[in-house]
């Protein structure tokens, strides 16, 4: 090799060495991952904010529109949007193992089960009681399921944050003047709301499991929600679709499909890349807070003092999970760096 070429070769070698070191450096890798907008807990909180608009939007539906039909319409259209815009949904089935295909099917069943159980629970117990039972039980179910399946034992931080968030959520929506039911709650309605929380915890945990196994988030959620959208079509058709003929009905269905299903679950899938499912379900307890604030600002409802106190406790619990811990064990940091590297490979 000519002598005058050696400096150029040396410079290239040094550049390649720096690139190789930076790609292996956990600190630099973490910085590159964190540059992505709305990733991790922030993406999940944004999704929860979109979900919080569901109640306000559903009040604008035409009178007589069945609640189950409204929810099924949003899932059917939004689920198909997620499926059609996920380019890797078809290759995903081929890339999955047999056990992972079973997980996809179970996840789709859980997605379809949520509106089928939640909306009847609302009709029996009221919005406040159904919301606090479904969303309050979901983090508990997620933590227990993750523990039972060997995906991580819930830590003290998760337990403290979940306890604060559930208590704050309960004070927020069950304060006097908000629940709307003076008598005892309907037992079947409570059971249906708890089943809705279990459904939500199941498909969150399944989605996180498949993403952690190396599958991209968008195809995973697209496959689950596309199949679930097809599954709830009979519910929509049996409940009646006349309300969709009005502009208000069409606008509500479009909002539920585009914002609270398509966009919200895209953000949720992005957040699941680096957030454990049990923490993600706790973060989604921001949904009733957003729904309550919208009810005050848009619908003119008034909150008692206990609800404002509950809102503060809920915010503190969510902040406990959103703000990174200042001190972590070295092993935890190394596992986080390895997961970040896996996520970068998935999203390329």
Summary of predicted features, one role per range:
Residues 46, 73, 106, 133-134, ...:
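Hydrophobic core positions of alpha-helical segments in small-molecule transporters
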Residues 46-53, 57, 85, 105-124, ...:
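Hydrophobic alpha-helical transmembrane segments of multi-pass membrane transport proteins
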Residues 47-80, 129, 199-227:
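Juxtamembrane helix-loop-helix junctions in multi-pass membrane proteins
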Residues 61, 70, 121, 148-150, ...:
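Hydrophobic/aromatic residues within transmembrane alpha-helices
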Residues 77-81, 133-148, 227-231, 282-298, ...:
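Alpha-helical transmembrane segments of compact multi-pass small-molecule transporters, enriched
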Residues 82, 154-176, 294, 306-325:
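Hydrophobic transmembrane alpha-helices of multi-pass small-molecule transport proteins
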């Amino acid at each position: 090799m000519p002598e005058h070429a050696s400096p150029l070769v040396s410079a290239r070698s040094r550049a390649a060495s720096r690139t190789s070191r930076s790609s292996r450096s956990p600190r630099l890798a973490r910085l590159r991952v964190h540059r992505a907008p709305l990733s991790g807990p922030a993406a999940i909180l944004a999704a929860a904010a979109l979900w919080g608009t569901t109640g306000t939007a559903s009040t604008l539906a035409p009178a007589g529109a069945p609640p189950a039909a409204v929810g099924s319409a949003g899932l059917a259209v939004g689920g198909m949007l997620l499926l059609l815009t996920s380019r890797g949904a078809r290759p995903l089935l081929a890339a999955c193992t047999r056990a992972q295909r079973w997980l996809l099917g179970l996840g789709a069943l859980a997605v379809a089960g949520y509106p089928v159980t939640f909306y009847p629970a609302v009709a029996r117990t009221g919005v406040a009681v159904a919301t606090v039972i479904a969303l309050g039980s979901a983090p508990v179910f997620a933590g227990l399921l993750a523990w039972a399946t060997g995906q991580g034992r819930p830590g003290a931080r998760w337990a403290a944050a979940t306890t604060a968030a559930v208590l704050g959520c309960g004070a927020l929506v069950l304060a006097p003047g908000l629940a709307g039911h003076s008598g005892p709650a309907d037992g079947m309605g409570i059971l249906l709301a708890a089943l809705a929380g279990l459904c939500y915890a199941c498909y969150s945990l399944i989605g996180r499991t498949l993403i952690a196994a190396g599958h991209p988030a968008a195809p995973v959620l697209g496959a689950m929600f596309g199949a679930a959208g097809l599954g709830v079509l009979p519910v929509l058709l049996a409940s009646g679709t006349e309300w969709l003929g009005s502009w208000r009905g069409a606008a509500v269905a479009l909002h539920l499909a585009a914002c609270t299903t398509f966009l919200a679950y895209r953000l949720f899938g992005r957040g699941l890349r680096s957030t454990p499912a049990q923490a993600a379900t706790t973060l989604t307890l921001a949904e009733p807070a957003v729904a309550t604030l919208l009810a005050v600002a848009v619908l003119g409802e008034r909150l008692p003092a206990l609800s404002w106190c509950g809102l503060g406790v809920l915010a503190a619990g969510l902040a406990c999970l959103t703000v990174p811990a200042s001190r972590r064990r070295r092993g935890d940091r190394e596992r986080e760096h390895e997961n970040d590297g896996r996520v970068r490979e998935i999203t390329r």
